[in-house]
């Protein structure tokens, strides 16, 4: 089996690169991310037009309203505090963006490269560490900016380090630094592992390869949804912790 894997020359984590303005970029990740962003923007404008119209709300609008209301209720009851009005739409947008960028890889869009190998055109963006780290750092910067806006430029760092027990300040600092790392690696690890399994399935004989590949692709849709949901849920939790005041508790 080991010899077969080596002979197949499986390249997991490899990306097609190009140089733009002196910078090396992963073009497959950029393509998947750009398509996902366009879909999210189109969906946002569509929902906006439905909200401002006088017609009866459509199924898509009712679906997202139900998700938003249900998520708000569950999160607030779980963490015991109210969340800022802008946090939930941001988290839902991140959820949809991650979900679409990962689900694009399920589409049977392939091409033959210069070496004669068949390659997927749309790869899961979260299999690129640069993508997930950029998302995690974006969330990290945003919730700290929100915390400074709510608590003050002095009050936020003090509350952040002190927490509920001042003696735990060093541990709180390490925990805060680890948040973007754990947030990104959790998403990256699960999607990257899926890419490895797809590469191993490619070693099956052609006449039976479709069966395990179809089963895994179906499961991959579920994994992508769960990981996008966890990322969005942790985003809400981090914002709530950063903006927490004593009077916010129920």
UniProtKB/Swiss-Prot annotation:
TM region(s), chain numbering: 27-47, 83-103, 129-149, 191-211, 219-239
List the molecular function annotations (GO) for this entry.
proton-transporting ATP synthase activity, rotational mechanism
- According to Swiss-Prot or TrEMBL, what is its membrane topology? Multi-pass membrane protein
Cellular location(s):
Cell membrane
Q: Fetch the Gene3D superfamilies from UniProt.
A: ATP synthase, F0 complex, subunit A
Q: Name one GO biological process term.
A: proton motive force-driven plasma membrane ATP synthesis
Pfam families the UniProt entry points to: ATP-synt_A (PF00119)
Query: Among the entry's GO cellular component annotations, what is one?
Result: plasma membrane
Q: Which InterPro entries match?
A: ATP_syn_F0_a_bact/chloroplast, ATP_synth_F0_asu, ATP_synth_F0_asu_AS, F0_ATP_A_sf
Question: Keywords in UniProt for this one?
Answer: ATP synthesis, Cell membrane, CF(0), Hydrogen ion transport, Ion transport, Membrane, Transmembrane, Transmembrane helix, Transport
Please name the PANTHER family in this protein's record.
ATP SYNTHASE SUBUNIT A, CHLOROPLASTIC
Family of the protein in this entry: Belongs to the ATPase A chain family.
Q: So what does this one do?
A: Key component of the proton channel; it plays a direct role in the translocation of protons across the membrane.
Q: What is this protein called?
A: ATP synthase subunit a
Q: Which organism is it from?
A: Mycobacterium marinum (strain ATCC BAA-535 / M)
């Amino acid at each position: 089996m080991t010899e077969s894997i080596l002979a197949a020359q499986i390249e997991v984590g490899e990306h097609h690169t190009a140089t733009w303005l002196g910078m090396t970029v992963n073009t497959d990740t950029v393509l998947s991310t750009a398509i996902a962003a366009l879909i999210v923007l189109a969906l946002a404008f569509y929902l906006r037009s439905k909200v401002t119209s006088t017609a009866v709300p459509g199924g898509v609008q009712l679906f997202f309203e139900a998700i938003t209301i249900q998520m708000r209720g569950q999160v607030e009851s779980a963490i015991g505090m109210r969340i800022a009005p802008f946090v939930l739409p941001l988290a839902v947008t991140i959820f949809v963006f991650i979900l679409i960028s990962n689900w694009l890889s399920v589409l049977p869009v392939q091409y033959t490269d210069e070496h004669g190998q068949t390659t997927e055109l749309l790869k899961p963006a979260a299999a690129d560490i640069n993508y997930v780290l950029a998302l995690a750092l974006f969330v990290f910067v945003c919730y700290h900016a929100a915390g400074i806006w709510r608590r003050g430029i002095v009050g936020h760092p003090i509350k952040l380090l002190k927490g509920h027990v001042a003696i735990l300040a060093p541990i709180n600092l390490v925990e805060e630094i680890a948040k973007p790392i754990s947030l990104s690696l959790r998403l990256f690890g699960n999607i990257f592992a899926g890419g490895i399994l797809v590469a191993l399935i490619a070693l099956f004989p052609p006449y039976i390869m479709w069966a395990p590949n179809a089963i895994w692709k179906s499961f991959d849709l579920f994994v992508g949804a769960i990981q996008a949901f966890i990322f969005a849920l942790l985003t809400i939790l981090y914002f709530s912790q950063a903006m927490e005041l004593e009077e916010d508790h129920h």
